[in-house]
Amino acid sequence: MIDWNKIHREENYYNKEIENLILQHHGYELESRLFRQKVGSKEVDVILIVKTKEKEIKRAIGIELKENDIVKAVSQAIERREYFHHFYVVINLEISSIVKWIFLDSNLYLAIKGYGIGLISAYEKRMVLPSKFYNVYKLCDYIF
């Protein structure tokens, strides 16, 4: 059964401050944002369609929003990563809690690093770890 209250709470973790953290870090300009879109067989909470400032090359950034289950969020990010140039998990935890999770769970750390997943604390509105750029080709069929 769908917990609509939880979905509404998670959507509140995404705002202009979070968006600007991502855009400024990567030097992108926003073209559009999409909420709760299906890509492949999976739903993505937020998709940012951006372009580079110099050459205006389009890029796609996927974002998974979670209240506090970082393991589930990273697992979902991995399942969706192949469709996006960057992928972020935005989670409502303090930075210290996020860092503890990463250091206490070596598999979680390896997954985050291996897939280039970025982490943002919605609680503190700060980037913990930036997402790495990946060349992707599958997204074009869905977004561009």
PLM-predicted stretches and their roles:
Residues M1-E43, I49-K55:
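Acidic-basic catalytic patches of nuclease active cores, encompassing PD-(D/E)XK
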